[in-house]
């Protein structure tokens, strides 16, 4: 909403040039939010300025100035809703982390110092041998009973702090660098001998004559080609749907085999695959003239047509085309 506002010189009131109009509540809300954000930014800048001015006191002294500054920043962060204020909060956190790092470096810690003499004196006092502090020469006069009582007292106190004794890790094997030769296994030979003794050996194949068996792929391709040519002779002007010809609704594996065999028929030029008006693949016969057209982009010629087909796609095609019976049967195979 766009308004023309004229301010009087006296500053008493604002008059709208377009006449009397009500101020949009959303505009008032945006103005109030802007004032609130401006106040938060001002307080962040004042807080960072105070921390910079008192940097040496915060680092050197043991007061809680840094903690108080962090608490004040947390209170300010509750009202942060925009990126500008969040950036100021991030800058203050970086400054506070640097100060905390410097204060940590100045801490005096005696954790790494260990006085052996003082520790021994504490042990003597603990077991009740404080009389040794007055005359160190009496150490030479200690008999075995005093030493035994000393170690028993130490053992009793130490075992009370242990839930269980430490386990001993055994080392197995040889320490020699050279590896010993592996022993031969005789299990397989024993099994073969047992099978020979029991007479359970399978019949051995003496000779395989492949000449008496025609190649299965060539045989199936010729049989499917005969089915396709029979259909073309019966319906010379009607191409057959590719999916209806190769899909076997009762067997996914047979469908894959049919696709494989039909690809050889397409490769040898006895049929071709093209898309119909519905963009679905169809099979149609090839005559001599079409087989000779090498420049026709619609003629696939000697190309072998193979498609990928998943089990779910096969189920969808069977349902969509309502295929109930396979055109390629394997009854005589």
UniProtKB/Swiss-Prot annotation:
One of its GO terms (biological process) is protein sumoylation. Component of the SMC5-SMC6 complex which consists at least of SMC5, SMC6, NSMCE2, NSMCE1, NSMCE4A or EID3 and NSMCE3; EID3 seems to be a testis-specific subunit. NSMCE1, NSMCE4A or EID3 and NSMCE3 probably form a subcomplex that bridges the head domains of the SMC5:SMC6 heterodimer. Homodimer, and heterodimer with EID2. Interacts with the C-terminal region of CREBBP. Transmembrane segments: none annotated. This is EP300-interacting inhibitor of differentiation 3. Pfam families: Nse4-Nse3_bdg, Nse4_C. Tissue-specific component of the SMC5-SMC6 complex, a complex involved in repair of DNA double-strand breaks by homologous recombination. The complex may promote sister chromatid homologous recombination by recruiting the SMC1-SMC3 cohesin complex to double-strand breaks. The complex is required for telomere maintenance via recombination and mediates sumoylation of shelterin complex (telosome) components. The gene is EID3. It is found in: Nucleus; Cytoplasm; Chromosome, Telomere. Belongs to the NSE4 family. One of its GO terms (cellular component) is nucleus. Highly expressed in testis. It comes from Homo sapiens (Human). The keyword Transcription applies. Keywords: Chromosome, Cytoplasm, DNA damage, DNA recombination, DNA repair, Nucleus, Repressor, Telomere, Transcription, Transcription regulation.
């Amino acid at each position: 909403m766009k308004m023309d506002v004229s301010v009087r010189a006296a500053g008493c009131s604002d008059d709208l040039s377009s006449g009397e109009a009500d101020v949009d509540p959303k505009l008032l809300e945006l103005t109030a939010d802007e004032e609130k954000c401006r106040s938060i930014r001002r307080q962040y800048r004042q807080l960072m300025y105070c921390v910079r001015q008192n940097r040496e006191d915060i680092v050197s002294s043991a007061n809680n100035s840094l903690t108080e500054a962090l608490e004040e920043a947390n209170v300010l962060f509750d009202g942060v809703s925009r990126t500008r204020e969040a950036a100021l909060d991030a800058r203050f956190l970086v400054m506070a982390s640097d100060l905390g790092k410097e204060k940590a470096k100045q801490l005096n810690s005696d954790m790494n110092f260990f006085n052996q003499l003082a520790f021994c004196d504490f042990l003597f006092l603990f077991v009740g041998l404080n009389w040794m502090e007055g005359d160190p020469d009496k150490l030479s006069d200690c008999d075995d009973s005093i030493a035994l009582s000393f170690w028993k007292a130490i053992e009793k106190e130490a075992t009370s702090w242990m839930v269980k004794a430490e386990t001993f890790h055994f080392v197995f094997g040889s320490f020699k660098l050279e590896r010993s030769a592996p022993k031969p296994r005789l299990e397989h030979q024993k099994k073969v001998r047992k099978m020979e003794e029991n007479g359970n050996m399978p019949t051995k194949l003496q000779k395989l004559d492949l000449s008496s068996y025609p190649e299965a792929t060539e045989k199936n391709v010729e049989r499917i080609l005969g089915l396709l040519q029979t259909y073309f002779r019966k319906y010379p002007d009607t191409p057959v749907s590719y999916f209806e010809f190769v899909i076997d609704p009762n067997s996914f594996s047979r469908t894959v085999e049919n696709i494989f065999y039909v690809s050889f028929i397409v490769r040898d030029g006895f049929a071709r695959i093209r898309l119909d008006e519905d963009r679905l693949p169809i099979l149609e016969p090839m005559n001599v003239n079409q087989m000779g057209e090498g420049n026709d982009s619609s003629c696939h010629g000697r190309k072998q047509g193979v498609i990928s087909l998943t089990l779910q796609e096969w189920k969808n095609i069977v349902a969509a085309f309502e295929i109930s019976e396979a055109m390629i049967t394997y009854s005589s195979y």
